[in-house]
């Protein structure tokens, strides 16, 4: 018997990228399960979670993928990005080196992901105001220069987590609605079926994921 979470109009794959320790896993768990784990260790391999939201009267199911940021996981790059229509590029506002590495992550994203992918720059751990190492204005200017949307979040106290995911999913939905992307060869992810209007009956799960 299908659960309520299986009923949706669109399925969007969104990836979380950025250095290890910036809070990607906690952003994922805060948005999908409203949980935060102070003791969370670096993610090993890949995991994903889902959550459905309403965008302009349509049910959009987000399939959010998370992986560790360490170099040794580069081998999974192409599979990780395949079919992704959105990316949250995350850095830690209290660790400038994680912001410096945004450039490298952005290059990797543009090398491996679809050219039309929607990208949001996310300054996480905004609750660490007293330790801030990356000025908001600096990151905002960088985002504008690279045509990224931008937001600061705190997975710990929930600030802007909902807004970050809702904003990027809405932006993806509008791209679909405006025919910038679609479900055929012109679509994000090279027609992998990641963006799909749901038929009347629940689609097979395999249709929704990486082929």
UniProtKB/Swiss-Prot annotation:
Single GO biological process annotation from the record: eggshell formation
Molecular function via GO: GTP binding; GTPase activity
Record lipid sites (S-geranylgeranyl cysteine): 208-209
SMART domains the UniProt entry points to: RAB, RAN, RAS, RHO
Residues involved in GTP binding: 18-26, 66-70, 124-127, 154-156
Annotated membrane topology: Lipid-anchor
Pfam families: Ras (PF00071)
Record key words, sorted: Cell membrane, Cytoplasm, Cytoplasmic vesicle, Cytoskeleton, Endosome, Golgi apparatus, GTP-binding, Lipoprotein, Membrane, Nucleotide-binding, Prenylation, Protein transport, Transport
Chief localization: cytoplasm
Domain of life: Eukaryota
Annotated knockout phenotype: Zygotic lethal. RNAi-mediated knockdown results in a reduced meiotic maturation rate of oocytes. Embryos are multinucleated and osmotically sensitive with permeable and therefore defective eggshells. During the first cell cycle, 52% of embryos fail to extrude polar bodies, 83% of embryos display no or minimal pseudocleavage and the centrosomal-nuclear complex does not migrate to the center of embryos.
One cellular component term from this protein's GO annotations in UniProt: cortical granule
Disordered: annotated span: 187-211
Motif Effector region location, chain numbering: 40-48
Residue pairs linked by disulfide bridges in the UniProt entry: none
Reported tissue expression: Expressed weakly in sperm, but more predominantly in oocytes. Expressed in the intestine.
Compartmental location: Cytoplasmic vesicle, Secretory vesicle; Endosome; Cytoplasm, Cytoskeleton, Spindle; Cytoplasm, Cytoskeleton, Microtubule organizing center, Spindle pole body
NCBIfam families reported in the protein's UniProt record: small_GTP (TIGR00231)
Job description of the protein: The small GTPases Rab are key regulators of intracellular membrane trafficking, from the formation of transport vesicles to their fusion with membranes. Rabs cycle between an inactive GDP-bound form and an active GTP-bound form that is able to recruit to membranes different set of downstream effectors directly responsible for vesicle formation, movement, tethering and fusion. Involved in regulating the meiotic maturation of oocytes. Plays a role in egg shell formation, regulating exocytosis of chondroitin proteoglycans following fertilization.
PANTHER family the UniProt entry points to: DRAB11-RELATED
Quaternary organization: Interacts with rei-1 and rei-2. The GDP-form preferentially binds to rei-1 and rei-2.
Family: Belongs to the small GTPase superfamily. Rab family.
Protein name: Ras-related protein rab-11.1
Natural source organism: Caenorhabditis elegans
